[in-house]
Amino acid sequence: MNLISTSSIFTGILMGFVSYLSAAEWKKHTVVPAGKGSINGVSASDFDEDGQVDVITSVGGEVILLKGPDWKRFPVHQFVKGLARNKPRLACIHSCLMDVDGDGDMDFIGSNQTVFWLECPDNPFSGTPWKYRTVDDEILGTHCVVTGDVNRDGKLDLIANSFRDPNSTRFYNSIVWLEVPKKPHEATSWIRHVFADKDAPGGSHYMGFGDVNGDGRPDIASGAKGTQGFVRGQWFAWWEQGEDATKPWKKHLLATDEETPSNAIGKL
């Protein structure tokens, strides 16, 4: 599939449709009223399979599920100390959905000082907290989590960046893909593969996933800002997957000296 996409689906959808339809043809519906805190990621799915789309996000120290169409709020997780080695903040910096355990429903994946997943239960709106499990608590500065079948085994993997410095993590200036373990309910972490091994300096951000060179193997693209203390950023690049997806990939620079690049998205 010659397509590069990111989990920033709402941005992509809005950009595409706004160029086609006038603003007057769109009606705004408020799902979460304005208030304290920021919302950095929103995902949609019919979690209870009632035919209505629901929304999940994080804000104000919790992950919340909003049941469509009236958007009643159901907290499903509280960010508290002690669940991971890193103290969480009030909200995820990025998130996405993925059926981690193959049970047919969408689980929540978030990055909040730790990359984690919440298991969607049989009754997601029961009021019972969703089970929290760690994906990776050693990569740091993860501002993007996006899914894709990296090794072409028919199962989705997770792609995440780790832009913190050597004093913070041994996976500094890197981007990884994470393979779901055979027993995800029992595993303490996922299987990490570092494909951009210390050659993604600066503040790497949202990744694109697709077969750039048409060799049948999916590649990964990213951009990195270089302001606000991020050293050697301001670039766009893509990494070419080799025959062994678990080994470091070959980096190809697309552009340098770019002003605050963060997204790599397009159709080839």
Placement of each model-derived feature along the sequence:
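Bacterial N-terminal signal peptides
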Residues: 8-19
